[in-house]
Amino acid sequence: DILVADFRSGMQRLFGGRGVGFVPVTSVAAKFRPTIEQKAEGWTTWSMLTDRHHRYTLSGMTFEPKGKRSSISVKTTERYPELKTVSSLKFLYERNSCTRMELVCNGTQDTIREILEPTSGITQYEQTGTFTEAFFNFADAEGLQALGVALEDDSGVIVDNYSLRGNSGMILSRLDSTRCRELNKIRPYALVVLQYGLNIVSDSVLEYGWYVKRMEETVRHVRVCFPDADILMLGVSDRSRQVNGIFETMPAVLALLHAQRQVARRSGIAFWNVFGAMGGENSMVRFVENNWASKDYTHLSFRGGKEIASALLKAILLEKEFYDEADKVAR
């Protein structure tokens, strides 16, 4: 949520909506997210980074209970005003036979007891009201395969952050198209934003023709998975290396940025230049000096993410103005 948190907040402030959206059962980044407090016990995590036996959607993870009981707890935070309360609480799962679920909301003594609907496709269980926290407990859960929970409103803007660390983006070509279309029925995405590339930047690689080919294939597959969604690709951010004691932009960053532009142009999708928004060449030095990025001269901090989110939001709003004006002329 380094970039997404402030982007989500800005969109919801302007267009309505509340909540962090989809949250996987757990993840390696769970304890670092300031937008949600979460804890999970009694689950086996499967990731498409290491597993080829399960079918995956955008989160790239699926979860199966281990032991007699499994649980999920989530609690909203006040990091942003739009996160404090939500009106919809959902549990998303993609396989089930006869799981018994107990749900406690807002720390009350009242327990909701349900037998989850049997399914072999992506399904959601929903409660509506006013929520700040929830505790899910599962028993007799053999055969259950869970995705996560969603905290949101059913109106306004929902921004889901599907983060899978160590992912170059090309792995999205392995998304299961049937599963993704099932997901799209209950979470109909209007826009899919692809932000990848930083972890493949290397001093030893300046030719990214192979990347262009693979990412074109990936974009085509994402379109098959989410045919009603527009796609926006974010270019790689700046990354510095030290040369004679001075930090400067790695040449590979510029090479990859050119490759990403080619992918977007050839695929007919929108493109936004994060590198340019940072200030262009050697801008990472300024970000580190301002504590907007870590001293590895690679990774943005939450404060740096806020700068990029603000620039992205302004760019989208500017494009919206153009479309609104064109619509007026057309009328």
Question: What do the predicted segments below correspond to?
Answer:
Residues 160, 232, 270-272:
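Hydrophobic/aromatic beta-strand patches that form the interior of the parallel beta-sheet core
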Residues 3, 7, 176-180, 211-218, ...:
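Stable alpha-helical elements in mature extracytoplasmic
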Residues 191-197, 215-223, 230-235, 239, ...:
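Conserved, well-ordered alpha-helix/loop/beta-strand core segments that scaffold catalytic motifs
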Residues 1, 235, 301:
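Ser/Thr-glycine-rich phosphate-binding loops at phosphate-binding pockets of nucleotides
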Residues 6-17, 152, 182-186, 195, ...:
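Structured segments of extracytoplasmic/periplasmic soluble domains
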Residues 2-213, 299:
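Conserved SGNH/GDSL esterase-like catalytic core that processes O-acyl groups on lipids
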Residues 238-331:
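Catalytic His-Asp segment of secreted/periplasmic serine-dependent ester chemistry enzymes
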